[in-house]
Design a protein with these regions (language model features):
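Catalytic-site signature of metal-activated, phosphate-bearing donor transferases
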Residues: 1-92, 248
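Short coil turns that delineate tetratricopeptide repeat
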Residues: 71, 105-108, 149, 183, ...
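Start-of-helix register in tetratricopeptide repeats
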Residues: 75, 108-112, 153, 194, ...
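"A position-specific structural signal for the A-helix of alpha-solenoid helical repeats
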Residues: 79, 116, 157, 164, ...
């Protein structure tokens, strides 16, 4: 069989159906070689290899005559979906992912199945067959986020798709929600550092200015440039975004400085005007007093 692993159903039952996992600390790299019989049989035809895997797995799930028949094997359900997906048969993949999602068990695999259902619907194959493909895909992405709110992959897909579809309000909302999610250290299934290191920051930087949030866009693009975790082919575009934000912030700073100086000048002019008015009032009072003194003197003489 294929895609098998060591399992302990009794122990897993004590953990709400989830796998019992331990970790080996440190940084490791696995050197994987595909030199087995399956690879030799199909050579460079990866798609055919995956579809053959899918056929084997479906047989194990549906054919009672199959020696590996296990209709309730969650692993077979999941990898039937995976194999159809990698083989480019997205409608079949969708159906098997749905079965795996409904089956329950390991939460990460269940979550990923719902997430993959959305990706299936976004394929050219299913977009041609499903008039409301995006509505359904978006529902699955939101469901996936609801299942594991500390996984940001669905939010990235939502943000990017809405940006490309000219929906900046929604793109901004999802990118802003996702950019604060930290890398899920305790998860193990299909983790992408890129999502958490730079892709969500990039999406936020791409749409923040459209929402008038130049300050947040500047923070996002500044962090991208400072950390430099993106692939080199994205450097020029990201640098251009940063330059635009930087120029805007500089213009804002200059404008604010100008406003401060103008306010200071107005204050000084108003102060001078008040002082002039005060002096005029003092002069008028002095003149009035002198005039009064003169009148009093004249009255005294006339007596």
């Amino acid at each position: 069989m294929i895609h098998e692993y060591a399992d302990s159903p009794t122990q897993r039952a004590k953990n709400n159906g989830n796998l019992l996992i331990d970790r080996i600390g440190g940084n490791y790299r696995i050197h994987a070689r595909t030199m087995g019989k399956r690879t030799q049989e199909f050579k460079d035809d990866e798609q055919a290899k995956y579809l053959k895997d899918a056929e084997i797995l479906v047989g194990c799930l549906t054919n009672p005559e199959d020696p590996n028949y296990e209709p309730k094997n969650a692993r077979y359900l999941f990898y039937a979906g995976q194999s159809f997906f990698d083989g480019g048969s997205y409608e079949e993949a969708y159906n098997w992912y749905q079965k795996r999602a409904e089956f329950g068990g390991w939460e990460e695999e269940q979550w990923y199945s719902v997430y993959r259902m959305a990706q299936c619907l976004m394929s050219d194959e299913m977009r041609e067959k499903e008039p409301d493909w995006w509505q359904k895909a978006q529902d699955h992405l939101l469901q996936a986020w609801n299942i594991r709110p500390f996984r940001a992959e669905p939010l990235l897909t939502l943000a990017r798709t809405h940006r490309l579809n000219q929906n900046p309000n929604l793109a901004y909302m999802f990118a802003r929600a996702g950019v604060n999610i930290k890398f899920p250290e305790n998860d193990i299934l299909f983790l992408s550092h890129n999502v958490y290191d730079w892709e969500l920051l990039d999406e936020l930087a791409a749409v923040a200015h459209l929402m008038g949030d130049w300050h947040l866009g500047y923070q996002a693009s500044s962090k991208l440039i400072e950390e430099g975790k993106f692939p080199e082919e994205h450097r020029q575009r990201i640098q251009n975004n940063f330059n635009s934000y930087q120029q805007y912030m500089l213009n804002q700073q200059q404008q604010q400085q100008k406003q401060v100086e103008e306010a200071k000048q107005r204050e000084e002019m108003e102060k001078a005007s008040r002082e002039k008015h005060r002096q005029e009032q003092v002069a008028l009072k002095k003149k009035a007093k002198r005039d009064l003194d003169k009148r009093n003197k004249r009255k005294s003489r006339s007596r």
